[in-house]
Amino acid sequence: APMEPVYPGDNATPEQMAQYAAELRRYINMLTRPRY
């Protein structure tokens, strides 16, 4: 199973938040991908 991205914290930089958001979206896509 893919690793869940770690929340960078409330005082993270916008770049860190954007990176986290992108990783989280990819993680969720991997979890919800249908397995035929």
UniProtKB/Swiss-Prot annotation:
Modification type Tyrosine amide: residues: 36
SMART domains: PAH
Major subcellular location class: secreted
GO cellular component terms, A-Z: extracellular space
Key words, A-Z: Amidation, Hormone, Secreted
Subcellular localization: Secreted
Disulfide bonds: none
Superkingdom in the source lineage: Eukaryota
Signal peptide: none
GO molecular function, one term: neuropeptide hormone activity
GO biological process entries: feeding behavior; neuropeptide signaling pathway
Gene3D superfamilies, per the entry: 6.10.250.900
Keyword Secreted found: yes
Family under the similarity heading: Belongs to the NPY family.
Chain's role: Hormone secreted by pancreatic cells that acts as a regulator of pancreatic and gastrointestinal functions probably by signaling through the G protein-coupled receptor NPY4R2.
Protein name, UniProt field: Pancreatic polypeptide
Gene giving rise to this polypeptide: PPY
